[in-house]
C-alpha cells in the first residue's frame, strides 16, 4: 500500500514537473520576437550577433530573449571561442507537445468511437 502511494506520488510529481516545463516554454513563446528567433535557429546554430542583424534588434535584446528561451529549455548555448552560439533544443519542446496532445487524445478517441459506431 505504501509503495502504491509512493508510485502515485512520483507520477504526480512527474506530471507537475512536465506541466511546469510546458508552462515555462509556452510563456517564453508568448513573445513574438522569441518565436522569430527560434524560427531563425531552425536553420542551424547561430551567434547572438548574427541573430541580432536578422531580427533588427540590439545584441543585448537578443541576448535577453535567448536567456529566457534557454531558461525555458528551448535553446542551448555552446561556447565557440569568445562567442556563444545558440541552437534549438528539440527536447525542450516535448512538454509542450505532451500538453497539446493531452487535449487531442480524448477528442480523437471520441471521433474514432463515433466512426466505428456508424459502421
Q: What is each of the regions a protein language model found here?
A:
Residues 53, 64, 70-71:
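Alpha-helical residues within the helix-turn-helix
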Residues 25, 66, 82-84, 97-102:
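Short, structured secondary-structure boundary patches
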Residues 1-21, 39, 93-119:
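Amphipathic alpha-helical dimerization/coiled-coil segments
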Residues 70-81, 87:
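Beta-hairpin "wing" of winged helix-turn-helix
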Residues 45, 55, 66, 97, ...:
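Short amphipathic alpha-helical/adjacent loop interface patches that line ligand
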Residues 16, 20-61, 83-94:
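N-terminal helix-turn-helix DNA-binding core of bacterial DNA-binding proteins
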